[in-house]
Amino acid sequence: MTLQYQGEQYGKSTTFTIRIIGNNLSKSSSNYQIDLLVGDKKLPTFTSEIHQSLSNCLKEIYLFRKHNGITFNESSEKIVSLYVPYDKVLYNYNKYALFRA
C-alpha cells in the first residue's frame, strides 16, 4: 500500500510518500517494512529492520520525522496504489503512531 502526504521539511513544501510492504511469511504472522520517500528519493530511516507490527513501522517514521523537521498534513492523505481492504483498515487503526502530538 502506498500513501502520499503533503507536508514540509524545514519549511519547504513537498510531497512525502510512505510505501508499506507487508510480507506474510506464515499464516499466523506478518512482517512489515516501510519506506519514506521525498519524490523518488528514499530517505534513510533509523533502522532497516523488518518489524513484526505496522505500529512499530509507523513509530519509526514518526521518530524520523521528529528528528528531521518533517511535518505531514494529515488531511492531505491520498492512497496512490492498489490495496487490500484489510491493509487500509489496519493502517487506519495504527496511524495514530504516525501523528502523535
Where are these regions (language model features)?
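Negatively charged, low-complexity tracts enriched in Asp/Glu with abundant Ser/Thr
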Residues: 1-13, 72-75, 80
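Compositionally biased, intrinsically disordered low-complexity segments enriched
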Residues: 6-11, 35, 53, 93
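Short aromatic-glycine-(Arg/Gly/Cys) micro-motifs in beta-strand/loop hairpins
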Residues: 14, 20-44
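Mixed-charge, Lys/Arg-enriched low-complexity segments
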Residues: 39-101
